[in-house]
Amino acid sequence: MPPMGPQKKKADSWAGGSISMPLREDLLTPIAGENPSGIDLRHDTKLLIHDKIKEARRQDDDLAQGDWQSERKTANFPLVVKIAQDALATVSKDLQVAAWLTEGLLQTEGFSGLRVGIGLCQSLLTDFWDTVYPESE
C-alpha cells in the first residue's frame, strides 16, 4: 500500500489498526522551523524527553526481596504514550521515541496498538526519511 501522507490517513488507523486510546493527528505533521524533523533528542539537555520516557518505562523485577521489602515500581505505559506523542508532534520525529510509543501502545492496547505503532514508524520513515532521527550514518 503506497504512503498516503499525513493529511489522508487517520492517526489511529495506520496499518489497518484501531485502538481505544486516540493518537494525536499531528504526529506526522512536520515540526515548525528549519528542520521538519525538529531537534535531535539524543543531544537535548533541556527537555530530557528520553530520560522522562525511560523513567516512565522503568519497573522493578518480581524478585523476592526478603526482609527489606519495599513497594515495587511498575512501568507507567499510559505516561509513556503521552510523553512520546507530545514529543513526536511538537519536538522531534525520533524513531527511538516512536519505538517507545509502540511499546506503550502494545502494553496499553494489545496487538492492535502494536499494529498502529508499527504503522506510525513506517510512516515516519516514509514521510521523513531525509531528516528523521537518529540520522543515518
Regions found by a protein language model. Give the residues of each.
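N-terminal domain-start signal
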Residues: M1-S136
